[in-house]
Structure formats: structure tokens, C-alpha cells
Amino acid sequence: MADESNTGPVAAAVAADAEVKVPTAKKLRSPRPQKAAAEPAQPKAPAAKPRRYSEQERNDKLKLIETQVSEGNTLKNAIQSAGISEQTYYHWKGAAKPVGKKDAKSTKPLPAGDEFADLVKLEEENQKLRKRLAEKLRTENAELRKRLGLD
């Protein structure tokens, strides 16, 4: 209890701290420089209409790109030298593929009846082979049990 009644030095320390802390005036900063006045935007030249290439021009550019690539240039450089974008190149390349290649598989008629009969035969053969394998495994298992004396 003696410690609670002895408040003299603590009160003196608090009073000393209060005297030391004197508020100081804020530092003044120089004003910000004015932003440069925005110049009015120059209207851009109207975008030119996209160039339309004829089929002959497209094929010529595709051949040019192919020859440059075969000479050792990269595909990207060859496309840039032709003056077209990569997307345009791939679009033209896809459109230039002969249609016969895409439909070659579908033009050959598939005999549905023959394939179904073959499928049925294969399924039957598969079942026979599975039964044979199961029988063989059972006999081997029985022999091993006899050898080990588990039966």
C-alpha cells in the first residue's frame, strides 16, 4: 500500500514531459508548379480502308512466304516482309487449302452392314479369349496352391 500513496515522483515526471513537448509551427512548402497546359489533340489521319487482295495476290504472297521460309528465314520475318499480319497469313493459308483434302475421308462410302458384322465377330472372339484366359489363370492358381500346400 505504501507504493500506492507515493505518487510524488511520477507526478513530477509527467509535469516535466508536458513542459518539454512544445508544439512547433508547421513547415511551409512551396506551392506546386502549374501543370503544362494540355495541347489540343491533333486529329489523327482517318484510318485507311483495309486493303483487299485478290485471290492471285494472296496466292503470290503465300508462295513468297513459303520460299522465304524454305531459304532459311523465320516465318515471322517472311510474313512481315510480305506486308501482312500473322493473323492474315494463317487465315489465307487455311482458306487456300484444297477442299478435297478436308472431305477425302467423308467421300469414301463406309459399308455399315459389313462393319457391324465385323464388330459382332470381334466381340465374340473377345469373349472367347477372356474365358480362355480366366480358365488358364484358374488352373495355374490351383497348381500353385497344390505346390504350396494350401489346399
From Swiss-Prot:
Start and end residues of each stretch annotated as Disordered: 1-61
Domain of life from the UniProt record: Bacteria
Bias-annotated ranges (Basic and acidic residues): 52-61
Composition-biased stretches (Low complexity): 33-48
Keywords on record: Nodulation, Plasmid, Repressor, Transcription, Transcription regulation
A Pfam family it matches: HTH_Tnp_1
GO BP annotation list: DNA transposition
InterPro entries: Homeodomain-like_sf, Transposase_8
GO MF: DNA binding; transposase activity
Function: Responsible for the repression of SyrM activity.
The name this protein goes by in its record: Transcriptional regulator SyrB
Species whose genome carries this gene: Rhizobium meliloti (strain 1021)
